[in-house]
Curated annotation (Swiss-Prot):
<keyword id="KW-0677">Repeat</keyword>
<keyword id="KW-0723">Serine/threonine-protein kinase</keyword>
<keyword id="KW-0472">Membrane</keyword>
<dbReference type="InterPro" id="IPR000719">
    <property type="entry name" value="Prot_kinase_dom"/>
</dbReference>
<keyword id="KW-0611">Plant defense</keyword>
<dbReference type="GO" id="GO:0005524">
    <property type="term" value="F:ATP binding"/>
</dbReference>
<keyword id="KW-0675">Receptor</keyword>
<feature type="topological domain" description="Cytoplasmic">
    <location>
        <begin position="539"/>
        <end position="876"/>
    </location>
</feature>
<dbReference type="InterPro" id="IPR011009">
    <property type="entry name" value="Kinase-like_dom_sf"/>
</dbReference>
<keyword id="KW-1133">Transmembrane helix</keyword>
<keyword id="KW-0547">Nucleotide-binding</keyword>
<feature type="binding site">
    <location>
        <begin position="580"/>
        <end position="588"/>
    </location>
    <ligand>
        <name>ATP</name>
    </ligand>
</feature>
<dbReference type="InterPro" id="IPR001611">
    <property type="entry name" value="Leu-rich_rpt"/>
</dbReference>
<feature type="signal peptide">
    <location>
        <begin position="1"/>
        <end position="24"/>
    </location>
</feature>
<keyword id="KW-0418">Kinase</keyword>
<dbReference type="Pfam" id="PF12819">
    <property type="entry name" value="Malectin_like"/>
</dbReference>
<dbReference type="GO" id="GO:0016020">
    <property type="term" value="C:membrane"/>
</dbReference>
Length: 876
């Protein structure tokens, strides 16, 4: 009976394995994603036959790029020719459903090849996370290094999240993401995951790596370079064709083996771990591939350092046997010895293949699954335009914008306790998903376009103490239970600015009053409308007088830029649906032209910027073209409708980042590059235009950032040309912004290119410090240049650098940047550098370029800064 049970168990296991292998061969357990190829596209790899699909369905951020042309014809696999990079966020995540869901074991592999896709020639470094837990660091040697990172784990959820995390050493990217279903009975350990350290095929020199279809799990086997001390055995027969071993190394891998050339009694396998304290599991795969005589055998003992861990291991002909270290191993150097026992007919040890995995213990506990599901539903329902990727709460440094979480102890899942998605362009009804946030205390949905009634389930959230739904389009009656909780003080309820929403005890009275007393209000409203119409006509008439009669007030100007009718502008902006910016000129709206996003600047009737400034901006943008100046797509010039259409800048303006209005914190490297971009744009205005142009309103909010965080100068309505033959001065009424205005202007009432230099210097100081141009206290207002000078006089560079950087910056470049900024903000223009000199100095910081200074006068080779003494900051 026992023998029958054993036979039954073997047959069941064999059939299960056979079923699994059949499915592995048809790729039903594979997910293969080529990052960066066009949306919804796919193809079959020419070598492996694996079907790769676009990553567009698995990620909602990032920029797709193709590697540099010089590498595209170098024989690299097709799936390495494109990448998706992530310049905008600290953490960016793929969310991928696993082939069989949770509870099954998977091999998850990411592949990276830089290929100079961004034309920067700087190989980035960044971190890789699986969900909330650190996986590994990504470090590439050069542009053509192909790096594979693999991890084996059993997910707790149906989806896995693979995240790249920026650590201020270049922009993270991903080339390939692959998931492979494994047997749960393989790679068994008591730990959360195993990270691949190496996987070796003891084979012939020059052999290519083996993978699918040779390997049913699509593991990539790297050929080992064999030294002269060893020799290679091989066979042309298939190894393990009867599916003897669940690990199933590729037959092409197992058909070769390594042994000592002098038929030594032992074979030594050694490796030096990158971390001597880390724990490793070692998997040795063996198969006899030589035909032995009847009296011959190949067996050996396996030793770890000085201890035997397998007293006798005997090989079988053309069948794979796998030895796994019973416990994890560690140390500075790990030595395995395969030792042949004495005997005339015992052959020396061999090895066919080897895998080494590092133990990965998941120390971070993810957000409670109920909260995760709720937040994902909210994100999907409202298409929230925030950086909501990965786990909502963990790691704390990368938690979702607008949420706060709490974790009662180190063994429980964090819970969402506060959610602020006010002014987030939410539309539709309040979704039932909010009812699953059972730990939430504060919920702010104000400033959106939510419709329908306030759902009663909000009153049942047991921990809710603050609810704000102001400024929506909600209708009906506030639920009685919410009203009662508001009255008894257990809930702070705000629901104003919803015209069709009322409390239960006031609605009937309001309706009665509206029915019986509508005549008088209608009369009053009619009178008000007439008065307002008359006032508007009068103001419009006065505005026309102020703007003058410059001839071309209606219709196209003399420019090659595209002219749009106002009706077209209405369509481009979808009836001015989405405001993306505001200023003294009016509002900026989001628009789309032929599928491309644009920014639509509409001059309001009340704007201080009149037709003169509008015409100046069109004229200037018509003749300037530079990568660091915003480009004009088109314009509209109809009576009462003046519109400028620019290229769309996805990351808005520098001012928002410095003021902390965006959750993303600019790294030191990004700040340096943005500063250089802005300086290059201004340098082009000063030296690349004939006649030269002074911007006159340089400030952070006029420095726009595209999806790559490339900076471009904007807002040229106040710009003016100046003469280089004459004094180079512009006599002008006041222009510019307080804090950025050239101090000489107050005495001379004139501005020149050095005025832009001063303004840029103030911007550079803001970039360094993260502080505003003017800091106000109860007793005084201090300009940022005076504040920085006073601190640097004591040699304290760390005292001025933005604390949000947490000292993740180069001290030397911080000193140099400060020197440049203070030189630019000298009170006397003659002591300031030219914009060309500023660009030269910034390039030295950003690129480490040693520039040729022979074209500059000796007196301007060094930017000096006048502090309280004549000291120049050099304490680096």
């Amino acid at each position: 009976m026992a023998m029958l049970k054993s036979l039954s168990s073997i047959l069941f296991t064999s059939f299960a394995l056979l079923f699994f292998l059949v499915h592995a061969q048809d790729q039903s357990g594979f997910i293969s994603i080529d990052c960066g190829i066009p949306d919804d596209s796919s193809y079959n790899d020419e070598t492996t036959g694996i079907k790769y699909v676009s990553d567009s369905a698995f990620v909602d951020s990032g920029t797709t790029k193709r590697i540099a042309a010089q590498f595209q014809s170098s024989g690299f696999d097709r799936h390495l020719l494109n990448v998706r990079s992530f310049p905008q966020s600290k953490r960016s995540c793929y969310d991928v459903p696993t082939p069989r869901g949770k509870g099954f074991k998977y091999l998850i592999r990411t592949r990276f090849m830089y290929g100079n896709y961004d034309d920067l020639g700087r190989v980035p470094e960044f971190d890789l996370y699986l969900g909330v837990n650190f996986w590994d660091s990504v470090k590439l040697d050069d542009a053509t290094t192909i790096l594979n990172k693999e991890i084996i784990t059993i997910p707790l959820l149906d989806n896995v999240q693979v995240c790249v995390v920026d650590k201020n050493a270049g922009t993270p990217f991903l080339s390939v993401l692959e998931i492979r279903l494994l047997l749960n009975t393989t790679y068994e350990t008591p730990y959360d995951a195993l990270t691949l350290l190496r996987r070796l095929d003891y084979s012939k020199t020059g052999k290519l790596p083996s993978r699918y279809k040779d390997d049913i799990y699509d593991r990539i086997w790297t050929p080992r370079i064999v030294s002269s001390e060893y020799k290679i055995l091989n066979t042309s027969l298939t190894v393990d064709q009867f599916l003897n071993n669940g690990y199933q190394p590729a037959s092409t891998v197992m058909s070769t083996a390594e042994t000592a050339r002098n038929e030594s009694l032992y074979l030594t396998l050694s490796f030096r771990p990158p971390d001597p304290n880390a724990k490793f599991y070692v998997y040795m795969h063996f198969a006899e591939i030589e035909v032995l005589k009847s009296n011959q055998t190949r067996e050996f003992s396996i030793w770890l350092n000085e201890d035997v861990i397998s007293p006798s291991f005997k090989l079988r002909y053309l069948l794979t046997d796998t030895f796994v270290t019973p416990d994890p191993v560690s140390g500075i150097t790990i030595n395995f010895s395969l030792l042949q026992p004495p005997g005339e007919f015992v052959l020396p040890p061999i090895i066919n293949a080897l895998e080494v995995y590092q133990v990965n213990e998941f120390l971070q506990i993810p957000t409670h699954p109920q909260d995760v599901d709720a937040m994902r539903k909210i994100k999907a329902t409202y298409r929230v335009k925030k950086n909501w990727q990965g786990d909502p709460c963990v790691p704390v440094d990368y938690s979702w914008e607008g949420i706060d979480c709490i974790q009662s102890d180190n063994t429980t899942n964090p819970r969402v306790v506060s959610l602020n998605i006010s002014f987030s362009e939410l539309r539709g009804q309040i979704d039932p998903a909010f009812s699953n946030l059972t730990s939430i205390r504060k919920l702010d949905l104000s400033g959106n376009t939510l419709t329908g009634e306030i759902p009663a389930f909000l009153a049942n959230l047991p921990n809710l103490t603050e609810l704000n739904v102001e400024g929506n389009k909600l209708t009906g009656i506030v639920p009685q239970r919410l009203h009662e909780r508001s009255k008894n003080g257990s809930l702070s309820l705000r629901f104003g600015r919803n015209p069709d929403l009322c409390l239960s005890d006031s609605c009937s009275n309001t309706k009665k009053k509206n029915k019986n007393g509508y005549i008088i209000p209608l009369v009053v409203v009619g009178i008000i409308v007439v008065l307002l119409t008359a006032l508007a006509l009068f103001r419009r008439f006065k505005k026309k007088q102020q703007r003058g009669t410059l001839g071309e007030r209606n219709g196209p100007l003399k420019t090659a830029k595209r002219y749009f009718k106002y009706s077209e502008v209405v369509n481009i902006t979808n009836n001015f649906e989405r405001v993306i910016g505001k200023g003294g000129f009016g509002k900026v709206y989001h628009g789309v032209i032929n599928g491309e996003q644009v920014a639509v600047k509409v001059l309001s009737e009340e704007s201080a910027q009149g037709y003169k400034e509008f015409r100046a901006e069109v004229d200037l943008l018509m003749r300037v073209h530079h990568t660091n100046l915003t480009s004009l797509v088109g314009y509209c010039n109809e009576i009462n409708h003046m519109v400028l259409i620019y290229e769309y800048m996805a990351n808005e303006n520098l001012g928002d980042y410095l003021a902390g209005k965006r959750s993303f914190i600019l790294s030191w490297e990004e700040r340096l590059k943005i500063s250089l971009d802005a300086a290059q744009g201004l340098e082009y205005l000063h030296n690349g235009c004939k006649p030269p142009i002074v911007h006159r309103d340089v400030k952070p909010t006029n420095i726009l950032l595209n999806e790559k965080l490339q900076a471009k100068m904007a807002d040229f309505g106040l710009s003016r040309s100046f003469s280089v033959e004459g004094s180079g001065q512009i006599s002008t009424v006041v222009a510019g912004s307080i804090g950025y205005l050239d101090p000489e202007y107050y005495s001379t009432r004139q501005m020149n290119e050095k005025s832009d230099v001063y303004s840029l210097g103030v911007v550079l100081l803001e970039v360094i410090t993260g502080q505003p141009a003017i800091a106000s206290s109860k007793t005084e207002k201090v300009h940022i240049s005076d504040h920085v000078r006073s601190i640097l006089a004591n040699g304290d560079i760390r005292g001025i650098v933005d604390q949000r950087l947490r000292e993740r910056y180069d001290v030397g470049s911080a000193w140099k940047m400060s020197e440049i900024a203070l030189a630019c903000t000298e009170h006397t223009s003659a002591q300031r550098p030219t914009m060309s000199q500023v660009v030269m100095e910034l390039k030295q910081i950003v690129y480490g370029i040693v520039t040729d200074q022979e074209n500059y006068d000796d007196s301007t080779k060094m930017l000096t800064v006048n502090l309280d003494t004549e000291m120049v900051p050099r304490a680096r």
